[in-house]
Design a protein with these regions (language model features):
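Short, compositionally biased pre-sequence/patch detector
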Residues: 1-183
Length: 183
């Protein structure tokens, strides 16, 4: 899973790498560093992504295997990754505008406050743990909605007022009630 926040450095929540070689030949720390350096050299920000926007991508696929000692990504790899990101951005589902299909490959929020409002709404409805795009955010959060809201709102305190303003009054009251019970 890949998260891009406006112009900030992308965050990769989960990365799978297939290594072709023997276990004895594999140096896991060196492989990790090489993959990190290779991916860090690619600008994954899709053109037109507004500053502050949050794009969460379910999967990003590379091309054919790279040579084990690659020091730079070949230009066709870079072009392929950028084209995927462009498509994922332009076809992203918008949770703030309505339900997201279970097979959605990416979701887009206009900013962190919109993302927090949608996450709050899904926690209140008991749906957050079922949504693939919340998994990296909820990884270290308590399962109960009240303590989860307390942890999430505390970590994103500057976004809470705008997030609450976009909720329905009954949703905001319910969220405050759960939040208060968890303190």
């Amino acid at each position: 899973m890949l998260t891009i926040r406006g112009q900030a450095q992308p965050t990769i929540g989960h990365l799978s790498v297939r290594y072709r070689g023997t276990a004895a030949e594999m140096n896991a720390p060196a492989l990790r560093l090489r993959v990190q350096r290779l991916l860090g050299s690619v600008d994954l920000h899709p053109a037109g992504l507004p500053t502050g926007a949050v794009l969460i991508v379910r999967r990003l696929h590379g091309l054919a295997p790279l040579p084990a000692q690659s020091q730079i990504l070949p230009s066709d790899w870079t072009a392929h990754l950028r084209a995927q990101m462009r498509t994922l951005y332009t076809t992203a589902a918008r949770p703030a505008l309505g339900p997201v299909a279970t097979n959605a490959t990416s979701v887009l929020f206009t900013d962190g406050a919109e993302m927090l409002a949608c996450l709050t709404r899904d926690l209140l409805a008991g749906l957050a743990w079922q949504r693939w795009y919340w998994q990296h955010i909820l990884r270290d959060v308590p399962k109960a909605p009240g303590p989860a809201l307390a942890a999430l709102w505390s970590a994103r305190a500057t976004q809470v007022p705008a997030a609450l303003a976009s909720l329905e009054k009954t949703e905001a009251r319910h969220a405050f009630a759960l939040f208060s019970l968890s303190l």
